Amino acid sequence: QTGNVLEPSCGIGNFMGLVPESINDAKFYGVELDSISGRIAQQLYQKNSIAVQGFENTNLPDSFFDAAIGNVPFGQFKVPDKRYDKHNFLIHDYFFARTLDKVRPGGVIAFITSKGTLDKENPNVRKYIAQRADLLGAIRLPNDTFKAAAGTEVTSDIIFLQKRDRLVDIEPDWVHLATDANGIRMNAYFVDNPEMVLGDMQMVSGPHGMESACIAYENAELGDLLRDAI
């Protein structure tokens, strides 16, 4: 109900605007690289602390935030930051890594990210996260979830993490991929917990050939499916 909440890529503040009244007393900190979106957020949510700059340039203290939320930016490029350069993270992976350092031990992260975070063949970023946080759960969303808002069809996941109080050399099942009953490669968590996939996993034609996608169920309300999953 109170505490410090970070949104490291807040856009115009849509998430902040939809916060339940029960946590209205929390202090929200937003970061937004785009100057127009950031200034809009500053005007809309004047009681929040919103920095219009790159996440990598912020001076936010480590282990300060009780929670972090947001839709992390996605792309095939890296963010220059000496603290993390050795890990060779792409931008979405970088946002997970830096946010983990900003959240206190026991704090929770709830991020929306492309399915690439959990499904890519290279497990390095998942191992990095697992050493620093416990996976509380994940929900796979249909690829048309954000079509109306963003005009894109991308299979996305909501990932819930709780930061550990120390680094642990651990490699849980969700670090790795597995194959479902239909022969589709995906994160082992979703193979073990198919009820957390809110659609039908299929192989579809993508920009680089065939790829897996979560296709929405016909005549199903995503809101109802999401409530059941949570």
Predicted regions and their residues:
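Conserved ATPase-coupling elements of RecA-like P-loop NTPase cores
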Residues: F77-D81, E121
